[in-house]
Structures are given as structure tokens and as C-alpha cells.
């Protein structure tokens, strides 16, 4: 009995963990070049609301302005 119960613990932990992660994921949008958009955070807030976070992903060149924001209820998570 103890062995059966312990073999169920790990799958249950993973199910709970993945259920919580899905609820906390947001949406993401790429706005353009950080060379053109000088205030990436401000632009994200103006487009997606006060809970949006913007940052410049400097993967090369002038970088890319990326926004992370809460998904609308009708839009699926990524």
C-alpha cells in the first residue's frame, strides 16, 4: 500500500505544478526595434495597460522591444 501511494505522489505534484503554471502565463508581443522605440516600457504600458512589462532584448544591433502582458480572457495562452 505504501509503495502504491508513493508512486502516485510524483505524478500528482507535476499535475498541480503544470495547472498553476498555465494560469500564470501571459501573452507576449514584439513591438519593433529599440532604436525606433526609445521607451519600450512606456510603449508597452500605453498599448496593453498598467500591468504590461516592456524590455529591450539586445540580441543584436539596437535590440527588439518585447512586451509581456496579461492575456485577455478570449485569447489563448502561448
UniProtKB/Swiss-Prot annotation:
SS bond partners: 27-71, 34-56, 40-65, 44-67
Main location as per UniProt: secreted
Superkingdom, taxonomy of origin: Eukaryota
Gene Ontology annotations for the cellular component aspect, listed alphabetically: extracellular region
Subcellular localization, as worded in the UniProt entry: Secreted
Signal peptide: 1-23
Any single GO BP term: killing of cells of another organism
Keywords on record: Antimicrobial, Disulfide bond, Fungicide, Plant defense, Secreted, Signal
Protein family (similarity comment): Belongs to the DEFL family.
This protein's name: Defensin-like protein 171
Amino acid at each position: 500500500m505504501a509503495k502504491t501511494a508513493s508512486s502516485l505522489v510524483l505524478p500528482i505534484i507535476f499535475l498541480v505544478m503544470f495547472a498553476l503554471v498555465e494560469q500564470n502565463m501571459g501573452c507576449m508581443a514584439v513591438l519593433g526595434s529599440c532604436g525606433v522605440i526609445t521607451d519600450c516600457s512606456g510603449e508597452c504600458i500605453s498599448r496593453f495597460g498598467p500591468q504590461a512589462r516592456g524590455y529591450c532584448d539586445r540580441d543584436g544591433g539596437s535590440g527588439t522591444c518585447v512586451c509581456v502582458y496579461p492575456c485577455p480572457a478570449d485569447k489563448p495562452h502561448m
